[in-house]
Amino acid sequence: AIRLYPPHQPDLIQRPLFEAHSHIYASPEYLDEYGTPSSLTDLDQHRIVILGTDTRPPVPDLNWLETAGRETGKRRPAMSLNNIFAIRNVVEEGAGIAAIPDYMVEDRERLIRVLPDIEGPSFQAFFVYPEELRSTQRVNVFRDFLLEKVRASQF
């Protein structure tokens, strides 16, 4: 399995695959209509899209944009969705600004990185498998394949 959280089960082998980063993205149409923020505090005047709090986030700290640059409290989101792909899609269509993992936007030409000097939290992805499969050829071949693909990608 590929997990975006480290497993807590002691009988599982975990191999770090990559460290992923997230940044702030918006569409050109959104930026044309609402302007480009020049600081984190400017985000208070923008339409922030977040993952709903009743949803288990697929990646850690996905909603960091709610509090980034604020001394107290959270920004009120313009939209709260229950799926990270839906967040990417509505931002791509001009609905707002969101923190999105970079690996989800690398092939998306309609998303522009906003506040490029601001780094969101990073997180590790792990290849995880049961101890008893450690020496099986198919797991080793798949692991090697994953590592080769990871080296060729940017996260």
Language-model features, listed with the residues they occupy:
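C-terminal regulatory
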Residues: 7-125, 152-155
